[in-house]
Amino acid sequence: YKGKRVRVVFDGIYKNSRIWCNSYHIGKRPYGYTQISYDITDFVQFGAIDNEITVRVCHTDLADSRWFTGSGIYRKAYLVVEEQVHAVWNGVAFNVSRADEQSAAVCADAEIVNELDERVIGTLTASLKLCGSDEESVVFARVPAAMEAHEKKTFYLNGMIGKPKL
């Protein structure tokens, strides 16, 4: 994964968590019901060396939650590997403004960041895939994209999908 961005994601840690990557403190969260994500690229060691993610939880309050009375990592924890030009974490939103049996008008707002030290030019493609389906993704929009080094920009992609599954 050298040359790419590496992110660690926790879908749930309860509560008052502090997180380290290879002894570098990367963040803390005072509560525990929301997903947290940290870019750990600058702390990861590439090659044959093991990496270590450490999570510390401090739950000194007794029975302070009606939903979860335990402590620790209680949902998925995983790594995400991204290209140097990528969507900002949770930075893509889809909207269907009109739909009938024949077609659907689909919009996507995508916040993209260029982590490179150089300008990039390309094409941004938006597609959808029905969850749990073996069908191919349906491309509904393509736009030309140019971004300066370290720029963050929102792109608006609008298109149509024929015969949507309503």
What is the meaning of each model-derived region?
Residues 1-89, 115-116:
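Accessory beta-strand-rich segments of carbohydrate-active enzymes
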Residues 44-45, 100, 147:
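Hydrophobic beta-strand core residues of beta-sandwich domains
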Residues 84-117:
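Surface beta-strand/loop "capping" patches
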Residues 59-60, 159-162:
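Short, charged beta-turn/beta-strand-edge "cap" motif at the junction between a beta-strand
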Residues 34-38, 151-159:
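Short strand-edge motifs at loop-to-beta-strand transitions and within beta-strands
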